[in-house]
Amino acid sequence: MTPSEQPVLKVPFRRLRPEAKVPDRAYAGDAGYDLAAAESVVLAPGERAVIRTGIAIAVPDGYAGLVLPRSGLAVRHGISLVNAPGLIDPGYRGELMVPLINHDRGETFEVETGMRIAQLILVRAAEARFVSVELLEEGADSRGEGGFGSSGTG
């Protein structure tokens, strides 16, 4: 099945402020939908602020919304999300808000109304039931309890 043949997931949204922008992709096939600021905010070095997007969405059941940083803002200006990734559960109906932080040590950054400040991706979220066991079976990769750099850096 080609990307153009895949069914489109419909995500209801509500505009809460006139300056709010509908989440959109820069290029067809992109996974992330840009979230834009619905207000202007100045972030001093080291400062964080919660930025309003002016929209609310209804993430479909069986899915989750993940809010991720925009790489260009991070690389060029040191702007990132405080809680990356942010999680939007299917039951949440409030305004999408993006907690940004200015990691730059010397430059103030101005978030302007309409500026793309984060990306939203929608992912399937499995229904799970956790089952207590005495012993966990080894995975196919035999990793065991190795974590935090156990695969090396090279």
Predicted features by range, described:
Residues 1-154:
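DUTPase catalytic domain/fold
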